[in-house]
Amino acid sequence: MFKTPSNLPKINNTFMYCYRSLGKIAAILYIVLGSMVIGFLIFPVIRLFSKEKNDFFVKARRYVSNVFKRFLFMLKITGIVEMRVPEMERLSSMKGKVIVANHPSLLDFVCMTALVPNANCIVRANLTRTPFVGIISQIYITNDENYDDLFKACKEDLDNGNNVLIFPEGTRTPRFKRNVYQKGAARIAVYAGCDVQPVFIGGCDKYGLGKHDPLFSFNPVEKYFYDFILLPEIKSSDYAGMPTPAAAKRITDKIEEEILSANAEYRKNCRNCRTFNNV
């Protein structure tokens, strides 16, 4: 009745599969409607009580982070999503870092924003043409901005103790191949003179939240499980003195190497999942 990708097992419980698929669709609608309410009703109120633009950014991002936390808690108690964050305190208190992560699913941005309340995020410009426009266009940076302006905005945020969140793949990981890692995160780290914190997003296969997955679809054998693992920091000072393009390439290669290595180790040792992310 329901088809699943060839690399996944068959559905083991049709009732739970339908329940989770419908729950996922309801969650997406909730996010879409909630984003519009926040963007067009809540943000103007926050702006009224903000002394300056940076003050508004800080308050608005923290508000969004708290909303996403409550949203993820709702998904947990309804049995749709489970999360594990071994170093949550360290991640949530991080300052002045370029945070990079692999990108297996639609919820990665929501999860990372919930976990890192003081994070700016560089997002694809075409997202501003979606219902997320209410949030994205007001408090985050889109990747179609002039490079000089983008780098300056990121450096200013980092100098103020905020973080910059980037998914180096630029888009969600496809099911049967890998994306090329872009050098933008590394270039920002070199420009700002800050360190890079890679995060490996592990867990089960996120079928239903991947690129081009059908709307009515879900992992056939288990709820969505997310595992957020902090990897060793990459020090930009280790690449000081190198030309910027060379330093950016070396750092990008290191990011990819760390994430792929973490994925291989995770698949060997994880006992919580019956299926795994593609990375």
Which role does the model predict for each range below?
Residues 96-98, 161-167:
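Residue-level preference for the first positions of well-ordered beta-strands
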Residues 130-134, 176-243, 276:
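A cross-family acyltransferase "interaction/gating" segment
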